[in-house]
Amino acid sequence: MSALSRWLLIPPVSARLSERYQGYRRHGASPFSAALGCLWTILAWIVFPLEHPRWQRIRDGHKALYPHINAARPRPLDPARYLIQTLWLVMISSTKERHEPRWRSFARLKDVRGRYHQWMDTLPERVRQKTTHLEKEKELGHLSNGARRFILGVIVTFSLILALICITQPFNPLSQFIFLLLLWGVALLVRRMPGRFSALMLIVLSLTVSCRYIWWRYTSTLNWDDPVSLVCGLILLFAETYAWIVLVLGYFQVVWPLNRQPVPLPKEMSQWPTVDIFVPTYNEDLNVVKNTIYASLGIDWPKDKLNIWILDDGGRESFRQFARHVGVHYIARATHEHAKAGNINNALKHAKGEFVAIFDCDHVPTRSFLQMTMGWFLKEKQLAMMQTPHHFFSPDPFERNLGRFRKTPNEGTLFYGLVQDGNDMWDATFFCGSCAVIRRKPLDEIGGIAVETVTEDAHTSLRLHRRGYTSAYMRIPQSAGLATESLSAHIGQRIRWARGMVQIFRLDNPLFGKGLKLAQRLCYLNAMFHFLSGIPRLIFLTAPLAFLLLHAYIIYAPALMIALFVIPHMVHASLTNSKIQGKYRHSFWSEIYETVLAWYIAPPTLVALINPHKGKFNVTAKGGLVEEKYVDWVISRPYIFLVLLNLLGVAAGVWRYYYGPENETLTVIVSLVWVFYNLVILGGAVAVSVESKQVRRAHRVEIAMPGAIAREDGHLFSCTVHDFSDGGLGIKINGQAQVLEGQKVNLLLKRGQQEYVFPTQVVRVTGNEVGLQLMPLTTKQHIDFVQCTFARADTWALWQDSFPEDKPLESLLDILKLGFRGYRHLAEFAPPSVKVIFRSLTALIAWIVSFIPRRPERQAAIQPSDRVMAQAQQ
């Protein structure tokens, strides 16, 4: 390149060109791409007056106008990308110019839209004001209870008849389309309304469409003339029926979350009951358990009414000495039958408190835990159990491996944020094994914690409900713990939960037996059905292959009718769940969670259905490290198998599209769309199986907390603590950071009116951002530090509010990116025999996507882009 340029060009130009070539190479361009980039540059300078100010402005805005083209690393077909993007920008600019004279009509339309949203936002309050007089008049008050029940029965009967007609009435394609348009219009009309009315309306619309779909599937879509099609169709129908049942039960469960608030305790502390705090442990590290004990010691409760117990099923001397040192009780069993349940039951023989609070050994309670929960027990004498959320301050494998910690609600947020709150409405709150308080008298009546299944917590709450006792749930986080560190540990935990819930279904089925209300039976049933999702999910991931590979008609109907029934069913369910679950589970993420678990929970749940006594308890490991980024090939093997199977389906689909019967073309396209969606979801599952590095043993917790640091010379600086861990803190000094790395300073933190001092060393200074490492602390200082940080009453309460509202289309785009990321990981980590397939596939997709035009960046480019493009057109 250098010799050729020197021969053809004058020295200054040759030197500049050689410089450009070397710059391209330094940024990773191949020799051919770098040489071609230089050639395109020469041609551009010959054809276009790039030195003109107008072109200079375009070049200055390159990053904004052409965000997908790296000018420092050219590719052979970059001219085509520039051409496509330029045409796109010109089109945007021209369209805007054409419509500029009509800006007033658009402004009017925007004003109408704003008025509509304002009207919808204020509708519930206006309806309430206009119907207040009806509540006061009590127009039906003169009627007897029997008459009112009769009127209600008539209304319900007519509603059911109308619903039955809507569900079963057959329509031709045009009528079905019009019917769906009407329902969709109503859904769009009410979905922005605040309050519960809009959610109830969306549930009604979704149930109408979904019930109509299931009716159509059972009555019109099975091919009874072809055995293969019939068998495959029935298998898919089984999975769809399961999904429909879970959908209906799920709507019922969360239709009216209770959102229970704390009840104040009596002012006279002598009326407060005695409480035992149990911290069971088996093989966890002492450092994991210490913070829980330190926080328990600081709980705001009379010390003569509080007893803390370490229940050590590992029988370790270090734990015994630690308990003696900090002044808590210690119990170790000689035998270890029934795992955690047996450990707690053994401790119940020694503890004599009126209530027992149970924490897993990594769950750190806040100081307000008992004051927030115990008031309800004094108010309601039949209340047997109060559950609070399981909140985690470390990322679970999904959050860590996908980089979504505190960006997307995690897997457990839906259960603890919405489902348990919905259960509370129906008096069906489950005991979750930790972060809960149980009244001793009812617990003793049922013989202690249930030991017949491996999910002793849910089984215990079921027994309490059968005895006529009530339960409660408070959604305010009052403790926080460690999430599982690896995907394999996470899956192992879910396998235990799934096996245990199915064991309860078989051994103590909530649908039968005495003591439960109908609503409680349905809530328990839905919880157990949730863990049977493995087989249906695998069916959905392979169903389109029945047609593409076996030519079996799993839905025996024209492709147009399939679209008119399937798409509305999915869209309405997605829209309704987005409205109800928006803060707790973003759209399409359930697909990822279920796909990751499906293969692994299917066999144990099937075994538990057949033989409920088979299986054993496994302890979930906490507090581990992941020292290197790697793919868990053992865990990801099933996903890769399903990916290859679906790729085979794509190949078969392409063949059928070109060489199959013409009347099947639309069916082939629908099947391929389904397969591509499955491939995206499976790609997401693969992305989760790539374990990211976790080298911090002490997890950082983000917070905004006032504090101060004191230098040895007496100077004091106010600061804000923005993160902390068990080993150090990150602070921002309010003003100039007048500290040096290696300098020893004292950190001052407040708890209530009390101020505490902790010795630290400066390990990092970046502007006014300072990293502090805790120096060795005394036991008293360590207790104080935990109570000033992890155990603060307000530490966890605002975490849930930090999640953005769900936007289904944005969530779908996130899932698409996630799926592509999974295949990139396969191309990076796969064995040579497989790597070439996925590397070629991801490279092809990335190459195709690189030609798609992008919108210019908003802040930097959209405003000037119109002017620049106009200049370019001149």
Curated annotation (Swiss-Prot):
Activated by bis-(3'-5') cyclic diguanylic acid (c-di-GMP). Residues 271-364 are annotated as: Catalytic subdomain A. Gene3D superfamilies: predicted glycosyltransferase like domains, Spore Coat Polysaccharide Biosynthesis Protein SpsA, Chain A. It catalyses: [(1->4)-beta-D-glucosyl](n) + UDP-alpha-D-glucose = [(1->4)-beta-D-glucosyl](n+1) + UDP + H(+). The active site is at residues 313, 457. GO terms for molecular function: cellulose synthase (UDP-forming) activity; cyclic-di-GMP binding. Residues 694-790 form the PilZ domain. Its EC number is 2.4.1.12. Substrate binds at residues 360, 362. Catalytic subunit of cellulose synthase. It polymerizes uridine 5'-diphosphate glucose to cellulose, which is produced as an extracellular component for mechanical and chemical protection at the onset of the stationary phase, when the cells exhibit multicellular behavior (rdar morphotype). Coexpression of cellulose and thin aggregative fimbriae leads to a hydrophobic network with tightly packed cells embedded in a highly inert matrix. This is Cellulose synthase catalytic subunit [UDP-forming]. It comes from Salmonella typhi. The gene is bcsA.
